From Swiss-Prot:
Cofactor annotation remark: Binds 1 FMN per subunit.
Top class in the EC scheme: oxidoreductase
Assigned EC number: 1.6.5.-, 1.7.1.17
Reported function: Quinone reductase that provides resistance to thiol-specific stress caused by electrophilic quinones.
Similarity section: Belongs to the azoreductase type 1 family.
Lineage, uppermost ranks: Bacteria, Bacillati, Bacillota, Bacilli, Bacillales
Gene Ontology MF term list: electron transfer activity; FMN binding; oxidoreductase activity, acting on NAD(P)H as acceptor; oxidoreductase activity, acting on NAD(P)H, quinone or similar compound as acceptor
Protein name: FMN-dependent NADH:quinone oxidoreductase 1
Cofactors named for this entry: FMN
InterPro entries, per the entry: Flavodoxin_fold (IPR003680), Flavoprotein-like_sf (IPR029039), FMN-dep_NADH:Q_OxRdtase_AzoR1 (IPR050104), NADH:quinone_OxRdtase_FMN_depd (IPR023048)
One Pfam family linked to the record: Flavodoxin_2
Catalytic reaction annotation: 2 a quinone + NADH + H(+) = 2 a 1,4-benzosemiquinone + NAD(+); N,N-dimethyl-1,4-phenylenediamine + anthranilate + 2 NAD(+) = 2-(4-dimethylaminophenyl)diazenylbenzoate + 2 NADH + 2 H(+)
Length: 208
């Protein structure tokens, strides 16, 4: 039985947030098409994950060197391990998030920091870093109210670009990406943009 991990990084309701609507649409469509799949859903805002910083980094290093950890470090490392192992065990992963102020919401950065561990999602080699989880099937769902498709705006998009860059570093070079954009910039076409985007979400979910 396939294990599927759904990761949502938006605490706004679907009535107000397009990426939340994309997430709900994908999950419901996928569940209907795959009733026997083992599914785990992570709401990153609800989890209130501790920032990835000195305690977790020091704990991870000390463990790798066989050194004794403080109680605080043990707790931080255990939290990282919990979410890292969950990700490693998943056959398929879906990320859903908005673009806020040119990048992803902070909880997603924290979560990705948990997953970016040498020897687990990538390794160092004489020829440079090498991804270790390229066999996973991944979908990226992103929403942004402005239109970033132009040559001028594209470099300012650091949400989907950020996530797909990290995935590529881990060896996942071909994630399927669905983006809904411009629904705030073009209010006269907003409903059409969202509806057409959600249809694309359904198509991807049905065959995922």
């Amino acid at each position: 039985m396939s294990k599927v991990l759904f990761v949502k990084a938006n605490d706004r309701p679907a009535e107000q947030a397009v990426s939340s609507k994309m997430y709900e649409t994908f999950v419901s469509t996928y569940k209907e098409a795959n009733p026997n799949t083992e599914i785990t859903e992570l709401d990153l805002f609800a989890l209130d994950l501790p920032y990835y910083g000195n305690i977790a980094i020091s704990g991870g290093y000390k463990r790798s060197q066989g050194m004794e950890l403080t109680a605080e470090e043990e707790k931080a490392v255990a939290t990282v391990d919990q979410y890292l192992n969950q990700f490693l065990e998943a056959d398929k992963v879906v990320f859903a998030f908005p673009l806020w102020n040119f990048t992803v919401p902070a909880p997603l950065i924290t979560y990705i920091s948990y997953l970016s561990q040498a020897g687990k999602t990538f390794k160092y080699t004489a020829n440079g870093p090498e991804g270790l989880v390229g066999g996973k099937k991944v979908v990226v769902l992103g929403a942004r109210g402005s239109d970033y498709s132009s040559e001028q705006m594209a470099p300012m998009e650091m949400a989907v670009n950020y996530v797909t860059t990290v995935l590529g570093f881990w060896g996942i070079t071909n994630p399927e990406t669905v983006v809904i954009e411009g629904h705030n910039q073009y209010p006269d076409r907003s409903q059409q943009i969202v509806e057409e985007g959600l249809e694309n979400v359904k198509k991807v979910a049905a065959k995922f």
